[in-house]
Each structure stands twice: as structure tokens, then as C-alpha cells.
């Protein structure tokens, strides 16, 4: 499974390489 880097869009916490999937202005993004 591929993971998303910080600043990239995500749909769940498990998708993020580091940090968590959090709600931002434009949907959800990975933030550490």
C-alpha cells in the first residue's frame, strides 16, 4: 500500500507516511 506525504490529500489516517489525516480547507490532507 502506498502512503501519502504531508500536504497530500488523504482519506484515512493509515494513508499518511507520517503524521495524520486531518481536515483542512481543501478536504483532508496529511499533516505531521
Swiss-Prot record:
UniProt-recorded Gene Ontology molecular function terms: toxin activity
GO cellular component: extracellular region
Pfam families linked: Toxin_29
Cellular localization per UniProt: Secreted
InterPro entries for this protein: Toxin_29
Tissue specificity annotation: Expressed by the venom gland.
Superkingdom of the organism of origin: Eukaryota
Cystines in this chain: 3-17, 10-21, 16-30
Membrane-spanning ranges: none
Keywords: Disulfide bond, Knottin, Neurotoxin, Secreted, Toxin
Major location (coarse): secreted
Function: May act as a neurotoxin.
Domain comment as written in the entry: The presence of a 'disulfide through disulfide knot' structurally defines this protein as a knottin.
Similarity remark: Belongs to the neurotoxin 17 (21C2) family.
Entry protein name: U3-ctenitoxin-Pk1a
Amino acid at each position: 500500500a502506498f502512503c501519502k506525504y504531508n500536504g497530500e490529500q488523504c482519506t484515512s489516517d493509515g494513508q499518511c507516511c507520517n503524521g495524520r489525516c486531518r481536515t483542512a480547507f481543501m478536504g483532508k490532507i496529511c499533516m505531521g
